[in-house]
């Protein structure tokens, strides 16, 4: 499955440390959350790719991530404050986790619009998207009422599996700033 990090916050200058999600209303079937390890994905890159990516930066954009919402009637007006508060930011494609020291591939399909400079056709970014979304880097969390998931936004992507319609899924989220 594709994991794009639903509320990743990679589009922020200082992304949050982590998130806690509590399942309040859980569908009888479906509605799981997928997690993907960006550090394990980095570990499996060839040495050539690691060296090539080390000096690259990518642009992460709230506007890019919410382009469909912005195109809706009144969307730009509705999200005007969020657009002002979240200008595009540049982050290294390869970041070092501040606690573990492990390197991670710091891109995602939702907010990463492009790599600066050397990737005009998007082939490097598409390679990275395909690489980090491999099943071997993923785990699936199946929710029960009041289950709690905690993850490190600096090294893990997450995405809900939207396969539970017409059932309801209600979560409460706590974001931990770094």
What are these regions (language model features)?
Residues 1-148, 153-178:
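Non-heme Fe(II) oxygenase catalytic core, chiefly the N-lobe of the double-stranded beta-helix
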